[in-house]
Amino acid sequence: MPIKVKIKNDGEFISEKPVQIREIIRSDEVIAAVFNGKLIDLRSTIDSDGEVEFVDLFHELAPEVYRHTMSHILAQAVMNVYGKKNVRLGIGPAIENGFYYDFEILNGKITEEDLSRIEEEMKKIIEQNIPVERIEMSKDDAISFMTEKDQPYKVELLKEIQDNKVTLFKQGDFVDLCRGPHMPSTGMVKHFKLLSVSGAYWKGDEKNPMLQRVYGTAFLRQEELKNYLDLLEEARKRDHRKLGPALDIFFIDFDVAAGMPVFTPNGTVILKELMEFSRQLHIEYGYEEVMTPLVMSEKLWRMSGHWEHYKENMYFTTKEEQQFAIKPMNCPGHILVYKNKPVSYRDLPVRFFEFGKVHRYERSGVLHGLFRVRSFTQDDAHIFCRIDQVENEIAGVINLVHRIYSQFGFDYSAELSTMPEDHMGDEATWEKATEALRKAMESVGLQYVVKEKEGAFYGPKIDFHVRDSIGRTWQCATIQLDFLMPQRFGLVYTSMDGKYQQPVMIHRAIYGSLERFLGILIEHYAGAFPTWLAPVQVIIIPIADRHFEYAEKVKSEFVKNGVRVKIDARRETVGYKIRDAQSMKIPYMLVVGDREADSEAVSVRTRGSDFGSKPVKLVLEKITEEIATRSLKNLMEE
């Protein structure tokens, strides 16, 4: 039977025998192909009917191929630098904006200082323009080959492969186990930079050997690489793991409570402001605040399914021969509140929200400042409603998301994830629920991308991604429909005809984790919070000791009006105090001396401007208005 291959936007190819992709390409610029939805190498063989799309350097998948090849060049360079017999290879995939490779260096290690030497070796490999070859062989032969090369990690990977045929890629004397695809030659990749080296357990398991992971970035054009490196430098300056402790917002004591941040008075002020802002809006939108236990019995977690599916991420304690778990999620607690009294169709929708502290075990190797922790607070809410109410409820949540994100100056985007292959519930209910999500987003004019078959097994969902001030995106809010929990817990409401019906449950969080959201805000604002969020909103700087009394008088007026204010009474120069206040990102610095005391005024400075002498009354009015309206702008500049 002839093989028929439809070429996207370019007719059809018919062959009487299996054919390699490179035999049917019609341009020298093609680097890979997509066959029946799968990214493949040009040297791959087609032996069945299907549709092929060619990937050139302008295709959206080109960076993945480019970066994957760069990871092999990195591995080859490391073997050249440290000696082939001293290097054991782990894995080396392409990742977003870059690539990495894991190594075990026998009798040595890779240091940050070594990266420049490795880069130079990579450039030599690129200059040689070595052809990249694809090799097919049996799994047994590949195991023998890698055993002979003393590559135990590759042997382990090979033994896990189900197919009897595997692929390897060769460039010069370097050979690696890999599915591909790769660029046709090493000379086709040029613009790269090695970024860092860190530890990484083999397969991410702490029981396995610790390898060394070298990270790099690569782009098709030099300008893109430069822009990305500039972004990384700006992100480094904004890193919340440095700014947070420097601004006395939080710290983490890894000897006492790894992954569990400790918030100072400054950090606590910010978190309380975030919660109060959210609380006010939730009440406005018809939510009722609840508080549920931190520790609940094994029985509850078995019923919810967490015991079966989430046990490895939970913390436990046993008392009086009964096992308890510290809650990793708030939903079972909210279900208890719902079940506490009978619910009629007239009562629906019911909306509960809670600033619930949860604990989830994370491996120490993945902990990352406030972004990946073991203890955090969720702005968690659950809505119980009828299926015909879903659209309106989702629209209400989207509006609430908009109100909250706009307050911080965030743009955002949305994704709709639909029914996966493995799902519970009938398809008709899924379709109705998914359509309700679509209509809700469209009714409020929210643009979205559809992620086919990426919903949870218990319901479709909407994810929101915020974009920060330097263009990075962060997944924060989630709206999740759930058909499973109401069924597991036997949730019901009395319908109009007096019969019991099962409600739909909507899980949603907007900040997501308050701690993570705070980390995002620190980096978004580079620590310079808008006045309403700033831990210290005003600092008063007396020029000399004789001005302390007037400084206290000014402070008293601000405190009475709800402003967070301090006096810098240190025996330092005014210039030093101003520089220190600016380094601590305090929004307003009010300098007071003889002239100000005589005229009931203050000399006003902000983080970037000097407004000179202004009446205390005017300054107080501007600052209190700025705080009350939660303005992102400095109102003194208006």
UniProtKB/Swiss-Prot annotation:
Annotated ranges, domain TGS: 1-56
Q: Which cysteines are joined by disulfide bonds?
A: none
EC number(s) on file = 6.1.1.3
| Residues that, per the record, bind Zn(2+) | 331, 382, 507
Principal place of residence: cytoplasm
Q: Which reaction does it catalyse?
A: tRNA(Thr) + L-threonine + ATP = L-threonyl-tRNA(Thr) + AMP + diphosphate + H(+)
Listed cofactors: Zn(2+)
Q: What class of enzyme is it?
A: ligase
Q: Where in the cell is it found?
A: Cytoplasm
GO molecular-function term, one example from the UniProt record: threonine-tRNA ligase activity
Do the record's keywords include Nucleus?
A: no
**UniProt region (Catalytic), positions on chain:** 239-530
Please give an example of a GO cellular component term from this record. Answer: cytoplasm
Q: What function does the entry list? A: Catalyzes the attachment of threonine to tRNA(Thr) in a two-step reaction: L-threonine is first activated by ATP to form Thr-AMP and then transferred to the acceptor end of tRNA(Thr). Also edits incorrectly charged L-seryl-tRNA(Thr).
**Which proteins does it associate with, and in what oligomeric form?**
Homodimer.
What HAMAP family does UniProt report for this protein, alphabetically?
Answer: Thr_tRNA_synth
Question: Which protein family is named in the record?
Answer: Belongs to the class-II aminoacyl-tRNA synthetase family.
Its name, as the record gives it, is Threonine--tRNA ligase
- Organism this protein belongs to: Pseudothermotoga lettingae (strain ATCC BAA-301 / DSM 14385 / NBRC 107922 / TMO) (Thermotoga lettingae)
